[in-house]
Swiss-Prot record:
InterPro entries membership: UppP (IPR003824)
Protein name as annotated: Undecaprenyl-diphosphatase
Cell location: Cell inner membrane
Gene giving rise to this polypeptide: uppP
Assigned EC number: 3.6.1.27
TM segment ranges: 1-21, 39-59, 83-103, 113-133, 143-163, 184-204, 220-240, 243-263
Keyword match Plastid: no
Family affiliation: Belongs to the UppP family.
GO biological process entries: cell wall organization; peptidoglycan biosynthetic process; regulation of cell shape; response to antibiotic
Membrane topology: Multi-pass membrane protein
């Protein structure tokens, strides 16, 4: 890959990963629109690792407290502090893990098309609009296993490019009455095991074919995506309660309409 391609795609990943607009869709579309060769799924996952490091750093204090409560709950065999939230993240991850193992190859072969991305961008943009109207003031700490499983099932749909993992998990949480910040916080925490699972799956493939991954490109991509993702998350969390989801809904509808025009 050319250095300019790495920089642009890593920035796209970092900016779009935690916004409800589908980072995977943008990583597929940018090369297509600019006439660049597909960077491949391995690069996609590598820059996801960069965004993972950003979210781990942003939530480092929260994660430390949650893990402390979680291990205390195991030792005491009862819920301690906010340990339930860790269990909720775990249960919400199960559906995407199962569906990913079962349908990953099918999705890679048939769903990475401009038309699919256009349709899912529009449909789930509309869903985000109606979910935005249902939000209340529930925080992520009021999450239950039942709600987590519902959000987890929704997250599994995000295996299809254009749906947006962060978008559909926030949509589901908003529909369930969580606040904008609560929905975003749970979505971001939920991204941690999902990105680890995706990275692990691709790492197995890369071990079998180490030449498939240009390591110098990946190192640069990870750094750029990490820095841009951290800045984006910090800004997003600072304004989401004020701007709500309408700007992202409008963006998705415009993008989806443009893609339909482009690919039909």
């Amino acid at each position: 890959m050319e250095i300019s391609h790495v920089i642009v795609l890593a920035l796209v990943q970092g900016i779009s990963e935690f916004l409800p607009i589908s980072s995977s869709a943008h990583l597929i579309l940018v090369p297509k629109l600019l006439g660049w060769p597909d960077q491949g799924l391995a690069f996609d996952v590598a820059v996801h690792v960069g965004t993972l490091s950003a979210i781990l750093f942003y939530f480092k204090d929260t994660i430390f407290k949650l893990l402390r409560d979680f291990f205390a709950s195991i030792a005491q065999r009862k819920m301690v502090g906010d340990s339930l939230l860790v269990w909720c993240v775990g249960f919400a991850t199960i559906p995407v893990g199962i569906f990913g193992l079962l349908f990953n190859n099918v999705i890679e072969e048939y769903a990475r098309s401009g038309v699919v991305i256009a349709v899912t961008t529009i449909i789930f943009g509309i869903a985000l609009y109606f979910a935005d109207l249902r939000s209340t003031n529930k925080s992520e700490y009021e999450m239950t296993i039942k709600f987590a499983l519902i959000i987890g099932l929704a997250q599994a749909v995000a295996l299809i490019p254009g749906v947006s993992r962060s978008g559909i998990t926030m949509t589901a949480a908003l529909f369930l009455g969580f606040s904008h910040k609560g929905s975003a916080n749970f979505s971001f925490l939920l991204s941690i095991p999902v990105i680890i699972l995706a990275g692990g799956l691709e790492s197995i493939k890369l071990i079998k074919d180490p030449n498939a991954l240009p390591w110098s490109d990946i190192a640069l991509g990870v750094i750029i995506s990490a820095v841009s993702a951290y800045i984006c998350v910090k800004l997003f969390m600072g304004i989401i309660s004020r701007i709500r989801m309408l700007p992202f809904v409008i963006y998705r509808l415009i993008l989806g309409a443009f893609l339909l025009y482009l690919f039909l």
